[in-house]
A protein has these predicted regions:
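Conserved PLP-enzyme active-site core in the AAT-like
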Residues: 112-123, 127-326
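Secondary-structure boundary/capping residues
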Residues: 35, 103, 126-127
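Short acidic/polar alpha-helix capping motifs at helix-coil junctions
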Residues: 53-59, 103-106, 179
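N-terminal "arm"/small-domain region of PLP-dependent enzymes with the aminotransferase-like
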Residues: 1-84
């Protein structure tokens, strides 16, 4: 009998620790089957079931996806825009798993995540060191919306037409300062002329940078580096790729702050549109160049919907749990 009690206790303990914070709370709340007089108007799928086409739509996706689609005004699950309650706990858990100081879940893709970061950090008159491989969302966020001035890092192209890495000469400080003299002469001799560098950590054609080398070569010229990791995000969990991960770097107050954006839906476990922003800059606290949470979150709310789809958020939470390991 004692052995069975111990086995049952162990099983209960395992189940209690199995689910991550937000998904656990969401599952419990859905099980309560509370009525709502707010959004969404389909009322747990009831509206769909009033028409044959809607009924097939409901049956195809299953009951829980409709019951889990609820109003962001429901305080039981915490506000996703101001990061409270179980939503806050989920993002703190993900930050721990991915070795970030803070993590923000983004439900409208890394296109939005990149705009959040670039809008928070850049303004007109700032210099941005800009990888030619960058996704158009970085062009939109840094150059069009924020109005920053670019200094471009040229990319190689091999005989097969594949776009490779940034040319080695572009990482030379003298070369970069010559480019600055053309774009913004008044900043050519500044100790840190670039407010931000935007690097495509993994290119569409499969080139992945050594993050340590990038930081060592240009980090002293930049307040921050954004590594757009839309096509990667798995590198820190593969020992032979550890040097490619910006989030595994040991950073000092003289290093740049690090942002990493990841398309979880591409190479990790997430529904389409799920993305996350990792912020690693506690080593800059107390410095004028530090980007506080309030500033970043204002940019976050600029690009976030006030009607988030909770299953997307839950998928990001579960993705972190999967990557936690044993």
């Amino acid at each position: 009998d004692q052995e069975w009690l111990e086995l049952e206790a162990a099983a209960c303990d395992y189940e209690a620790r199995l689910l991550p914070p937000f998904f656990n709370t969401l599952a419990q709340y859905v099980e309560m089957d509370n009525s709502t007089f707010a959004c969404p108007g389909h009322q747990h799928g009831a509206f769909f079931k009033k028409h044959p086409a809607g009924r097939q739509f409901y049956d195809f996706f299953g009951e829980n996806v409709f019951r889990a689609d609820m109003c962001n005004a429901d305080v039981k699950l915490g506000d996703l825009l101001i990061h409270e309650g179980s939503a806050k706990h989920a993002q703190k858990f993900a930050a721990k798993v991915f070795n970030a100081d803070k993590t923000y879940f983004v439900l409208n893709g890394t296109s939005a995540a990149n705009k959040v970061v670039t809008n928070a950090l850049l303004t007109r008159g700032d210099l941005v060191l800009f990888d030619r491989n960058n996704h158009k969302s970085n062009h939109h966020g840094a150059l069009i919306q924020a109005g920053a001035t670019p200094v471009y890092l040229e990319a190689a192209r091999n005989p097969f037409g594949f776009i490779g890495g940034i040319d080695e000469c572009c990482f030379d400080e003298h070369y970069l300062r010559d480019l600055i003299r053309e774009a913004a002469p008044e900043k050519a001799n500044a100790s840190r002329p670039f407010r931000l560098a935007v690097i495509q950590l993994g290119t569409y054609d499969g080139t992945v940078y050594n993050a340590r080398q990038v930081v060592d070569k240009i980090g002293h010229l930049c307040d921050y580096i954004l590594f757009d990791s839309a096509w990667v995000g798995y590198e820190q969990f593969i020992p032979m790729m550890a040097d490619c991960s910006p989030l595994l770097l040991e950073l000092t107050p003289d290093d740049p702050g690090i942002f990493v954006t990841q398309s979880v839906h591409k190479q990790q476990a997430g529904f389409s549109q799920t993305s996350q922003i990792h912020k690693k800059d506690n080593h800059l606290r107390g410095q004028a160049r530090f980007c506080p949470h309030k500033r970043l979150n204002n940019a976050f709310m600029l690009h976030a919907s006030t009607s988030p789809f909770y299953p997307l958020f839950a998928a990001l939470d579960v993705n972190a749990k999967i990557h936690e390991g044993e």
